[in-house]
Amino acid sequence: MSGLREAALVAVRDLMGATPGETLLVVMDGGTRNVGYALYQAAAELGCEAMAIEMIERTNHGEEPPAPVAAIMKHVDIVLAPTSKSISHTTARAEACAAGARCATLPGITEDCMARTLGADYAAVGARSRRYADVLTRGATVRITNGEGTDITMSLVGRQGSADSGVYHNPGDFGNLPAGEA
């Protein structure tokens, strides 16, 4: 079994919790076509009513997908969006989740990245992400430095940490794959 195929099965079956008969839409562009079709094929193999739409690559991160794509996103159980530019912070994605879709975006994903990262132990990823989110929630200040001269200090007061576990099984769930952010 190829690394990309196995990673696609993990994404659809384990991380999105897809079950036979659920509707699953893959939104992709020319730069992510191979990843998109691997996800589509995994969904079909698992018995989902799989659909794939290839749109023209967006110019910027956060640019809305075409209106017909946004409309379909609101009428499916699961949206997987491996796109060259992120659609995470778009009205289309937010409205799809508000309508009950489970959504995962995979901005800039490559075949190699997907094959290497989606086989991670997502129970451990989620636990680590929640632990760091809790630290951020309880913290007052964060300072970020590196050897290249970065030295940023900022307040965390009034901010809530948010864990991205990579597991999106409930209606309206959303996050990025690969996951693990806090």
Roles of regions detected by a PLM:
Residues 1-182:
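Active-site bordering "gate/hinge" segments
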